[in-house]
Amino acid sequence: MFLGPGGAGGQAFDQAR
C-alpha cells in the first residue's frame, strides 16, 4: 500500500520520487 509520506509504504514512495 502506498498512501504517501508518513503512511503505509510512505518511505518507499518517497524514495521512488
From Swiss-Prot:
Expression sites by tissue? Nacreous layer of shell.
| Record-given protein name | Uncharacterized protein IMPP18
Instruction: Specify the species.
Output: Nautilus macromphalus (Bellybutton nautilus)
